[in-house]
Every structure is written in C-alpha cells, then in structure tokens.
C-alpha cells in the first residue's frame, strides 16, 4: 500500500511542478522579463531566452507533464491491481483523477500565476537545461504541429492594452491621474492630422509684404501673435513669417521705411494630412514654432504652431495674452457661417 501512496505523491509532485512552471512562464509580463534581464542575473537572462522562443520550453514542460500523468497512472494502476479488489478500482480511479485535477493542475497553475515572476526566475535555468535534453523529441513534435501553428506572430501588446493598463494603474494608485491622461493623449498623436489642429485660413492674421513697417505699425502693435504670416497680394502667396519682436525692434530703430517682406523669414510648409506625431518631429528638426499648412491643391489651408501639437499631450494652454481660448473652434464656426451665406451646406 505504501508503494501506491509513494507513486501517487511522485505523480502529483511532478505534474504540479510542470503545471506551475507552465503557468508562471505564460503569466510573467514580457516587459518585466526585459527589465530583469538588464541586471545580468543568470536566471533573468535564461528567462528572457525562454520568453524569446517559448515553443520549445513549453513543449518540454508539456511532454514532461504527460510523462508523469500517463506513465504514473499506468504504474499506479498496476500497483492498485495488486493491492485492491476489483470492486474498489472504480472508486480508486475517481479519487486519483480528482487528486490529479486539484493538486496536479488547478492549485499549481493558480500558484504559478499568482507568483509568476519569482517562480519563473526559479525554474528558468532548469527548464533551459531540460529543453536541451528533450530537444530531439520536441523538434519532432514541432515538425508535426508546424503546419497548424505556422503564421504571423501576434504582437505581445497593442495600443488598447497599454491604454487599459494606464487606466488600471491610475485606479490602483500606481500612477497619478495626470500621468494616466498623458499616456492616453500620446496615442492621439497618430490619430490626429494637421487639418484637425491648425488654425484655418479664415481666422489667420497676416500682413501684406509690400507694405512698410510704418503703414502696418498699428496692426503690428495690436497683434496678439508673436509670429505673423507675411503674404504677397493673396493669402495663398506666402512670402514668409515675421517675428513681431523683429518688426517692433525695426520700428523703434527708425526703420519704418522698410517693407514687411524684408524682415520675413522663410516659411516651412506641411501638408494638411500630416499626422501630429510627424508634425512634432518636424518642429523639432526644423526648430520652428509655426508652419503653414497647405491643402491638396497647394493653397494655404491654415497655420499650425508647436503649441497646437503640444496641447494634444497637455490639454489647452492659455496664457495671459490669449483672448480666445479655442481659435480652432471659433474658426470652424466662422467657416460654417460663410458657407451658409454662400448657400453651401457645411
């Protein structure tokens, strides 16, 4: 009878370890594995190697688990036949099945999931060693299963999961509310385009390049913008962009006879379909704060500032000189009114 108890114990122990190891390896976050591997801990490095190619280590664990369950059940059945009467064999088989399910599967997998990181680090090196031993058998299984499992690799995470984790982290107190909002807004950068963020042409402040500083003095002083668009005869004929500070400095120095165009700097142009994340990179590379947005026909659709793009991340930025909190919204309303006057449905 002692032989049966010992055999059952060995089967449950082996099956439990395999189930626990499998659950731990699947449950430990990939980001956590990469973070741990940076410490040059041998177990962490082994764990990263396992997660990089999971099919063989998991195949090894599954093979071992089945060896314990199948061979163990056969051995236990043979021993039970010697010591138990036929009438008790059905009851014994039911009890053995229940023990394997509870102590060989459910409890070990629950523990493996709950303490995934610690268990995964503990078993990483032994699993790699066992994988080498069982390589021929696992390779054979791979060749049989490849036609059914071959396909595009599924990404380890996606945008929706990261957003959800940010929200979950905020609710659990791991990150602050403003940090959660910032993470959520980052993903808007590749969803929004220049046309969504720009100040449309109907509300753009601009000056004619042919006029002198003296002629535009009042307009320059009253302008609320630090950068002013300079055009030729029409708004689509952009000559450049002038800094209000440069214009005022020239006026103070008695250079009112100069034309606005003389003080204009070259303008940078971007298509209205450019994504916000690309725009941000453009602003960084060009070291500009204002760019002209052009439509598909090459006409001026509006202007966009670095602040417009940054506000996607931070929310509305309003300083002491701002008279209108949302120029884009005002511009949209004006554009709809103009279209209505012309009999065109907005």
From Swiss-Prot:
GO cellular component: plasma membrane
Cited CDD domains: CBS_pair_CorC_HlyC_assoc (cd04590)
Disulfide bonds: none
Membrane topology: Multi-pass membrane protein
Cleaved signal peptide residues: none
CNNM transmembrane domain location: 1-179
Record field: transmembrane: 1-21, 58-78, 87-107, 121-141
Organism superkingdom: Bacteria
Annotated ranges, domain CBS: 198-259, 263-320
KW Cell wall biogenesis/degradation (keyword) present: no
Subcellular location: Cell membrane
Keyword field contains Membrane: yes
Keywords for this protein: CBS domain, Cell membrane, Membrane, Repeat, Transmembrane, Transmembrane helix
Pfam (any one): CNNM
InterPro entries membership: CBS_dom, CBS_dom_sf, CNNM, Ion_transp-like_CBS
First-listed, main subcellular location of the protein, grouped into a coarse class: membrane
Family of this protein: Belongs to the UPF0053 family.
Protein name in the entry: UPF0053 protein sll1254
Species of the source: Synechocystis sp. (strain ATCC 27184 / PCC 6803 / Kazusa)
Highest classification ranks of the organism: Bacteria, Bacillati, Cyanobacteriota, Cyanophyceae, Synechococcales
């Amino acid at each position: 009878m002692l032989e049966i108890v010992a055999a059952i114990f060995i089967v449950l122990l082996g099956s439990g370890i395999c189930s626990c190891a499998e659950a731990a390896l699947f449950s430990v976050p990939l980001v956590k594995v990469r973070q741990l591997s940076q410490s040059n801990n041998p177990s962490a490095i082994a764990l990263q190697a396992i997660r990089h190619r999971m099919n063989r280590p998991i195949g090894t664990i599954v093979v071992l688990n089945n060896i314990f369950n199948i061979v163990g059940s056969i051995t236990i059945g043979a021993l039970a036949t010697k010591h138990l009467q036929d009438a008790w064999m059905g009851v014994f088989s039911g009890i053995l099945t229940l023990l394997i399910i509870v102590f060989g599967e459910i409890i070990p997998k629950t523990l493996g999931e709950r303490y995934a990181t610690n268990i995964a680090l503990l078993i990483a090196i032994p699993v790699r060693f066992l994988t080498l031993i069982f390589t021929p058998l696992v390779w054979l299984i791979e060749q049989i299963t490849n036609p059914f499992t071959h396909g595009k690799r599924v990404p380890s995470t996606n945008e929706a999961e990261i957003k959800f984790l940010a929200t979950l982290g905020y609710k659990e107190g791991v990150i602050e509310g403003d940090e959660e909002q910032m993470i959520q807004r980052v993903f808007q950068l590749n969803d929004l385009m220049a046309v969504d963020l720009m100040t449309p042409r109907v509300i753009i402040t601009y000056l004619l390049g042919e006029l002198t500083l003296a002629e535009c003095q009042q307009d320059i002083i009253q302008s609320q913008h630090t950068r002013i668009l300079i055009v030729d005869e029409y708004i689509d004929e952009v000559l450049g962009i002038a800094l209000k500070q440069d214009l005022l400095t020239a006026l103070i120095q008695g250079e009112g006879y100069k034309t606005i165009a003389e003080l204009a700097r070259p303008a940078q142009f971007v298509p209205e379909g450019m994504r916000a994340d690309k725009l941000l990179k453009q602003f960084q590379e060009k070291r500009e704060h204002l760019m002209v947005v052009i439509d598909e026909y090459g006409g001026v659709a509006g202007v966009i500032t670095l602040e417009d793009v940054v506000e996607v991340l931070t929310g509305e930025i309003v300083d002491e000189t701002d008279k209108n909190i949302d120029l884009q919204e005002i511009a949209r309303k004006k554009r709809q009114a103009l279209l209505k006057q012309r009999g065109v449905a907005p």
